[in-house]
């Protein structure tokens, strides 16, 4: 969810952080249906680092540039195969579906905040060693460990 704190407007959508070099490099390139927002956390606040390119993008997107205080310094709908640089230095760049700017009613100087959607971690199988010996007795639905007995329902 992304919130325009100044106007009390909310965009209810999936939000992810691009806070590593690889995530920022990948961005939304080659995403066919941009239906979520990506917030780029830049290492330093300046205009050059906040520049974006739209090469290899499959659709147009809305882009909002924020300073380190999360105030809007620039915003626009970015078209494919172009380069964009914000008017002022920026520390955060929000890329999202076209309509994001309109939904939030964004203007320069607005204070923007967000709530990142939690990603569920993938489960990874691991080997676990049990002390002692395990045997199964099917007739009584019992698992027998060498040290104790556990009755299963």
Swiss-Prot record:
Pfam families xref list: DUF192
Superkingdom in the source lineage: Archaea
Classification via NCBIfam families: PRK03760.1
Record-stated family: Belongs to the UPF0127 family.
Name listed for the protein in its UniProt record: UPF0127 protein TGAM_1372
Organism: Thermococcus gammatolerans (strain DSM 15229 / JCM 11827 / EJ3)
């Amino acid at each position: 969810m992304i919130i325009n704190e100044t106007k009390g407007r909310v965009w209810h959508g999936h939000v992810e952080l691009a806070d590593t070099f690889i995530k920022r490099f990948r961005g939304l390139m080659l995403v066919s249906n941009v239906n979520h927002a990506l917030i780029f956390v830049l290492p330093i606040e300046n205009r050059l680092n906040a520049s974006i390119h739209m090469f290899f993008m499959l659709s147009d997107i809305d882009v909002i540039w924020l300073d380190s205080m999360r105030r809007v310094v620039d915003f626009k709908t970015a078209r494919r195969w172009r380069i964009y640089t914000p008017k002022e230095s920026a520390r955060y760049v929000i890329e999202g579906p076209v309509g994001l700017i309109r939904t939030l009613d964004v203007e320069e100087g607005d204070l923007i905040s967000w709530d990142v959607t939690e990603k569920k971690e993938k489960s990874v199988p691991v080997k676990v060693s049990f002390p002692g010996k395990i045997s199964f007795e099917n007739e009584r639905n019992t698992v027998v460990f060498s040290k104790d007995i556990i009755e299963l329902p």
